[in-house]
């Protein structure tokens, strides 16, 4: 299912770069969520081709293609919201994240163990490590902290602005991702949220067999 999620996220990113923001000053990240995809398979009948009907069946809800702007700090909060603790185990719900994004994550330390919380994170500077530890301390519900966030190979600082491309449901905090609600400059396109994938598949023939690698590696 995550392979399709990454594909949809890449399509969302390309659509916003085509219809809304054609510049290169701000990085653009695409997101998709499992709650907006009705099946983990894009080629539902396995014939090696993806039809308009299959895309429309995959994405049949009444959402719009949408965009907003987040800070790097809020992007990290979104990424952290994929993770939950359940009976002491770390569980992950997969967001579809565009393939131009990389990051690392590590579990927040338990109470009284904050000194060990960042031991496993591969950070380049002590300042970054301290900032990440502060984020764990600031949100007692955080299961992980996010480090080394980069878009298109460029490190993203907490105060950097990032354009987010997704669907109207997710960007309004749907699927229990409230960090998206911190966004500014929210806007919806006059198109259903399936349209970016239609355009993407038309522009990139032969993508039906793509196997995307989920982003986000554990430290």
Residue ranges with predicted function:
Residues 1-122, 128-219:
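Catalytic centers of hydrolytic enzymes
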């Amino acid at each position: 299912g995550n392979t399709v999620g990454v594909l949809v996220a890449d399509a969302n990113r390309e659509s916003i770069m085509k219809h809304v923001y054609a510049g290169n000053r701000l990085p653009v990240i695409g997101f998709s969520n499992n709650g907006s995809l009705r099946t983990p398979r894009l080629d539902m009948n396995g014939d090696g081709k993806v039809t308009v009907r299959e895309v429309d069946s995959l994405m049949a809800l009444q959402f719009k293609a949408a965009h907003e702007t987040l800070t790097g700090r809020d992007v990290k909060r979104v990424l952290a919201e994929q993770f939950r603790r359940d009976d002491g185990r770390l569980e992950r719900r997969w967001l579809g994240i565009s393939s131009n994004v990389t990051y690392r994550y590590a579990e927040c330390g338990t109470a009284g163990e904050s000194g060990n919380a960042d031991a496993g994170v591969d950070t380049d500077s002590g300042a970054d490590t301290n900032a990440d530890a502060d984020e764990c301390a600031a949100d007692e519900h955080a299961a992980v902290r996010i480090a080394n966030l980069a878009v298109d190979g460029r490190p993203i600082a907490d105060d950097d602005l990032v354009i987010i491309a997704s669907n109207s449901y997710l960007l309004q905090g749907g699927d229990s991702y409230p960090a998206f609600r911190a966004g500014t400059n929210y806007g919806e396109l006059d198109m259903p949220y399936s349209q970016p994938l239609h355009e993407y598949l038309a522009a990139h023939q032969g993508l039906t067999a793509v196997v995307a690698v989920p982003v986000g590696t554990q430290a």
